């Protein structure tokens, strides 16, 4: 098979850069975070600008971490400042460098997801001027893969020059900086961008582009640490590998060559990760057989849709139950909008750390919640998990319920989720996260086609009598539409109104309760302000 050439492009600190472009700031020299501070300081920042990351902050820090870091920075600046005092504040790196008496500040921009989607669409339009849609895979709002194999000869330039031209065009039209990786497969392009390009100096035009093939990947990155820098290696994978003494991609590659009689062999990897070990071994060697054409042609065996939210604070059983019903109601409308029905509903209930840690009771708000948390901390004897911050928390509750037959009925789905919530949720605990899943999705057209297939079930006498009585009853009162069919017409009407007048143009009575979150979520995209 002929060698292919892929380009991966990542828009640097996309959300923060989009805000800086709108405000006329230099995205690389402005202390800016995108976060909704009305959600308290524990809210996760959607983006952190590059100049703030230079202080050692991660890209998805919480707002209180940003403020704590700036407090440290300003303590250091105060010691070094003439007179030992800081007068005034600035969020611009150039001003801070020029005036040591200024305190480092931060500009907090409220998320505007609609704006970011529009900017992303504009940049996608730039990609389309160079590469056809069938050769582009949109990986996320700020990242794409492009198969440029068939374009290099036509443009008369190499992949590096083509990537640079596209990146320069993006900057000229949006002032957003991008980084690129070039590889002989999508994995190498991604790793070149994520690891190599982000750690090399920019060229004269401020552009960072790195290129890898299988041999240069092994030479440059087989000893790279940490493993979590590599695509698809999360903290869980890294912990399992490091527990076995496998610290690098080179270690994994060598392990895959081991003999059956040796401890380190590919069987060890399959024992740790099952079938996913095959992908891990391929990536350790720099192999990736999947192409963009394969992605476009992929048809999953099963489909599902989900809706999840992390609540701004801990809530009790009844409030969480209300929110779960709201989410189920919204998800049912999403099913109707997509023209699909669900055969099964799933639910995950995540608990708050205050349910076990009495030191955190002060964060629970109302006296009622504090009483629940205090009782839970004393009485709870169920399974315990440890979150990413090392805190003990009750293990999340999970469950699913069969709908009997596929449905998109709001009433049916809402009742099923309510029944499931009451079955799996622990009334003693405080809830912080909820996730509702509609599974076993089937298109309405497919269901209609199934109904046209003759049913060859052998009837018995009672079936015939019952059917005859029902037929006479229908004839007596006149044909009426099924209740679910009537509800679907109502749902489609609601969707039409929402599209025209906004998501809060039609709301349910339960959305008016003080603790309901439906109206707030209707003004969000992906959990952030639209």
Each language-model region and where it sits:
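Gly/Gly-Pro- and Ser/Thr-rich, intrinsically disordered tail segments characteristic of DNA damage-repair
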Residues: 1-292, 461, 466-530
